[in-house]
A protein has these predicted regions:
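Concave beta-strand-loop units of leucine-rich repeat
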Residues: 1-11, 15-95, 99-116, 120-180
Length: 181
């Protein structure tokens, strides 16, 4: 079962509590509270540009694909036990990736976030990483060791710069060398 409420003025999700939703799209709505989603069989949740700060309501859902671009969320501990495949935290306030440690995550978008440490990603089978290299102070070697197929700094509707890890790291290393001269 799918429900699309994108670009509506819906604020209160309590009327859908208990529905057997598997895909839920509520991007660009004024929704702040996800508690009504607790226990739903959600596999996909798209909540781009919503004022959601607390995602604890999805902690018991089997979410595999999650988009939170532009949400003011900071704490992602609710993601710790989810069977995630793809997570987009682009332009969120997330700083700590620790809750993702040990997951089977394949795609992660953390560009334009305050994340500075990639160490929690060690051992995760990521095939795509989108991030802001200039923000990273710890764990860049962890990113180099990931089994990536694509890596970049932008991946949204307006722009994509994904490339092979070999091409990305060659350009990254050249930029680092030129900045230390």
């Amino acid at each position: 079962v799918e429900l699309y409420l994108e670009d509506t003025q819906v604020q209160d999700l309590s009327p859908i509590r208990g529905m057997p939703l598997e895909k839920f799209y509520l991007s660009r709505t004024p929704v702040r509270d996800l508690s009504a989603l607790e226990g739903m069989p959600l596999v996909e949740l798209n909540a781009v540009e919503c004022p959601i700060g607390d995602i604890s309501g999805i902690a018991k859902s089997p979410i595999q694909m999650l988009w939170l671009t532009g949400c003011p969320v900071e704490d992602i501990s609710a993601l710790r036990t989810l069977p995630l495949v793809s997570v987009t935290l682009h332009r969120t306030k997330v700083k700590n990736l620790g809750p993702l440690t040990g997951t089977a995550l394949q795609r992660l978008h953390i560009a334009e976030t305050p994340v500075t440490d990639l160490s929690p990603l060690k051992g995760i089978p990521l095939t795509r990483l989108v991030f802001t290299p200039a923000n990273i102070t710890t764990g860049i070697e962890v990113a180099r060791a990931l089994p990536l197929q694509e890596i970049g700094t932008r991946f949204d509707e307006s722009s994509k710069d994904l490339q092979s890890p070999a091409a990305f790291w060659t350009a990254y290393d050249a930029a680092v060398r030129s900045s230390t001269k």
